[in-house]
Curated annotation (Swiss-Prot):
It catalyses: N-(5-phospho-beta-D-ribosyl)anthranilate = 1-(2-carboxyphenylamino)-1-deoxy-D-ribulose 5-phosphate. Keywords: Amino-acid biosynthesis, Aromatic amino acid biosynthesis, Isomerase, Tryptophan biosynthesis. This is N-(5'-phosphoribosyl)anthranilate isomerase. It is an enzyme of class 5 (isomerase). Belongs to the TrpF family. It comes from Geotalea daltonii (strain DSM 22248 / JCM 15807 / FRC-32) (Geobacter daltonii). The keyword Isomerase applies. GO terms for molecular function: phosphoribosylanthranilate isomerase activity. Pathway: Amino-acid biosynthesis; L-tryptophan biosynthesis; L-tryptophan from chorismate: step 3/5. Its EC number is 5.3.1.24. GO terms for biological process: L-tryptophan biosynthetic process.
Amino acid sequence: MTKVKICGITTVADAMMAVEAGADALGFVFYDQSPRNLEPAQAAEIIRVLPPFVQVVGLFVHAPLDFINTVTDRCRLDVVQLHGDEPQEFCAAVNRRVIKAFRIKDITSLDHMDEYNVAGYLLDAWSPKAFGGTGVTFNWDTALIAKKFGPIILAGGLTPENVAEAVHYVSPYGVDVSSGVEAAHRVKDPEKVRQFIQRAKECLGSM
């Protein structure tokens, strides 16, 4: 069954709603240029009240290693998601399992993926304006090729309307959504979250 991560969590209410809807993981953004950015203290307060067995993921972009490792300990993160140009050596120095994000323009965006030895690979649409959360899709054929490198988490423009098609076509390890289930910036829509998770988990992949 496909795993589902709801990213850009900013409140206890949204966190608990996503968990109750069946989310496997919650994402917290530690990037001050994102509209979904949280201070570590804010995230820690939300994470503290989560039930067990929910994976907590911290998203970072070009952050100093010391900052990442400090936040992982303070917030008790399970996984770190790196969205910048961090090399394998940097990933290896992070004190948690790492998901490395690749922003996909075309097939050449996978050229350096074989240099990484990480827990998973997140594929998102390339944008000149943002590192994720853009609501833009990319050619899913690229994701099929990327599966040979390890567990693939599909992101980029996913919504309740297209997630079943994406899962059926790519059969990824997981899917990741942020803007696609929002009612407004920083606010999740409960019905969209419920539909997204239900459709992602009910669909059987083709591969």
